[in-house]
UniProtKB/Swiss-Prot annotation:
It comes from the Eukaryota. One of its GO terms (biological process) is negative regulation of transcription by RNA polymerase II. CDD domains: Prefoldin_UXT (cd23158). InterPro entries: Prefoldin, Prefoldin_subunit_alpha, UXT. Involved in gene transcription regulation. Acts in concert with the corepressor URI1 to regulate androgen receptor AR-mediated transcription. Together with URI1, associates with chromatin to the NKX3-1 promoter region. Negatively regulates the transcriptional activity of the estrogen receptor ESR1 by inducing its translocation into the cytoplasm. May act as nuclear chaperone that facilitates the formation of the NF-kappa-B enhanceosome and thus positively regulates NF-kappa-B transcription activity. SUPFAM superfamilies: Prefoldin. It is found in: Cytoplasm; Nucleus; Cytoplasm, Cytoskeleton, Microtubule organizing center, Centrosome; Cytoplasm, Cytoskeleton, Spindle pole. GO terms for molecular function: beta-tubulin binding; chromatin binding; microtubule binding; transcription corepressor activity. GO terms for cellular component: centrosome; chromatin; cytoplasm; cytoskeleton; mediator complex; nucleoplasm; nucleus; protein folding chaperone complex. Ubiquitous. Expressed in prostate epithelial cells. Expressed in mammary epithelial cells. Highest levels in the heart, skeletal muscle, pancreas, kidney, liver, adrenal gland, peripheral blood leukocytes, lymph node, prostate, and thyroid and the lowest levels in bladder and uterus. Overexpressed in a number of tumor tissues. Homohexamer. Component of the PAQosome complex which is responsible for the biogenesis of several protein complexes and which consists of R2TP complex members RUVBL1, RUVBL2, RPAP3 and PIH1D1, URI complex members PFDN2, PFDN6, PDRG1, UXT and URI1 as well as ASDURF, POLR2E and DNAAF10/WDR92. Interacts with LRPPRC. Interacts with androgen receptor AR (via N-terminus). Interacts with estrogen receptor ESR1; the interaction relocalizes ESR1 from the nucleus to the cytoplasm. This is Protein UXT. It comes from Homo sapiens. Changing L59P: Causes dislocation from the centrosome.
């Protein structure tokens, strides 16, 4: 016995809805999580560079030739140390490379790196907004496909 055309249309609609829901959850939401996680890592890097800038500015203001401090060796294990010359600093360039710079050079590097990281975070924010817009558009399409009405919000009195 053949299925009625209306029932086939309902089944086809149900399959489409399932495919769209799967695409939203498996692809778009996963991509959104990846973009937001990457942006969070960029924010962490930016915060570290800004913290380093503050330390360098304090060093320049203090004008001490020696610096007493504690260094974290890992796992919150700190040791006391003395930095005999504070006129130069080693800065992590990335990919495991470090460069010895004067404090002024380090500040210039930090400014450039901070602006690049800010541009990257802005780009990632824009990407996340595009993905959210795609999710919203697909959800609206699903709503229409399922024949759901968009109920207006009740006015708050």
């Amino acid at each position: 016995m053949a299925t009625p055309p209306k029932r086939r249309a309902v089944e086809a609609t149900g399959e489409k809805v399932l495919r769209y829901e799967t695409f939203i959850s498996d692809v778009l939401q996963r991509d959104l999580r990846k973009v937001l996680d990457h942006r969070d890592k960029v924010y962490e890097q930016l915060a570290k560079y800004l913290q380093l800038r503050n330390v360098i500015e304090r060093l320049q203001e203090a004008k001490h030739s020696e610096l007493y401090m504690q260094v974290d060796l890992g796992c919150n294990f700190f040791v006391d140390t003395v930095v005999p010359d504070t006129s130069r600093i080693y800065v992590a360039l990335g990919y495991g490379f470090f460069l010895e710079l004067t404090l002024a050079e380090a500040l210039k590097f930090i400014d450039r790196k901070s602006s690049l990281l800010t541009e990257l975070s802005n780009s990632l924010t824009k990407d996340s907004m595009n993905i959210k817009a795609h999710i919203h558009m697909l959800l609206e399409g699903l709503r229409e496909l399922q024949g759901l009405q968009n109920f207006p919000e009740k006015p708050h009195h």
